[in-house]
């Protein structure tokens, strides 16, 4: 693990524990890795018929139910209006991108060539996400996809440290206000830098909050806020 990621993970643990400090006995969190699966539309595919769509969705939900039953799925649900053809996000409690990819290869929509999985290792606190009360009883939350914009400015030394400190301070403020459930970085050095999961569904409020982040102001990060319908009780 590189030093910068290590500092970020430590800070995330501190901010989540700090947000829980109002409790008599605040929980202690440790960081672990999950696999974030983004199911994306395959370009050029035609819309399936209603009967076929029902069959594929039944297979999709049956697989998710089995994964939840084994403790291999922690969170899942469709996204509304995400960029890049992303239709659904799934958080898997498995140890590697390869394992997650193997599981998703068995997904009904993927087998039919309608969706393709994009898998990222995600660092986050253990024990925040809870088993669903019922897979088909949903509730809305907001997924924040944190990306590095094309042509983002490069900084080093004290300037970069100041931006990172301000970034973490803003995350802590969002957690302390109760808007943010969990946050964490991606394990790889790509365009997708991390994700936020918000219980607050007021996107205008959340847009104002993330806009206060010095790294966003400096053009180093951008955050796409996407409505996400997840099983009730998970967040």
Residue spans of the language-model regions?
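Bacterial N-terminal signal peptides that target proteins for export
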Residues: 1-9
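Bacterial N-terminal signal peptides
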Residues: 8-18
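Conserved, structured core segments of small domains
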Residues: 24-235
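Sec/Tat signal peptide C-region and signal peptidase I cleavage site
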Residues: 19-23
């Amino acid at each position: 693990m590189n030093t910068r990621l290590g500092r970020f993970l430590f800070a995330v643990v501190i901010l989540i524990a700090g947000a829980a400090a109002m409790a008599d006995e605040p929980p202690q969190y440790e960081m672990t890795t999950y696999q974030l699966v983004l199911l994306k539309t395959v370009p050029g595919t035609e819309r399936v018929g209603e009967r076929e769509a029902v069959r594929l969705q039944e297979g999709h939900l049956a697989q998710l139910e089995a994964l939840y039953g084994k403790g291999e799925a922690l969170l899942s649900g469709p996204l509304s209006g995400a960029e890049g053809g992303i239709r659904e996000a799934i958080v898997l409690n498995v140890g590697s991108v390869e394992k997650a990819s193997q599981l998703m290869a068995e997904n009904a929509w993927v087998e039919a060539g309608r969706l393709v999985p994009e898998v990222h290792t995600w660092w986050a606190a253990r024990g925040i996400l809870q088993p669903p009360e019922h897979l088909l009883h949903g509730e809305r939350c907001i997924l924040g996809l944190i990306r590095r914009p094309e042509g983002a400015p490069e900084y080093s030394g004290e300037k970069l440290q100041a931006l990172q400190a301000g970034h973490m301070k803003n995350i802590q403020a969002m957690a302390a206000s109760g808007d943010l459930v969990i946050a964490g970085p991606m394990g790889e050095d790509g365009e997708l830098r991390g994700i936020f999961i918000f219980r607050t569904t007021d996107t205008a409020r959340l847009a104002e909050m993330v806009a206060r982040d010095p790294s966003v102001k400096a053009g180093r990060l951008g955050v796409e806020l996407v409505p996400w319908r997840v099983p009730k009780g998970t967040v």
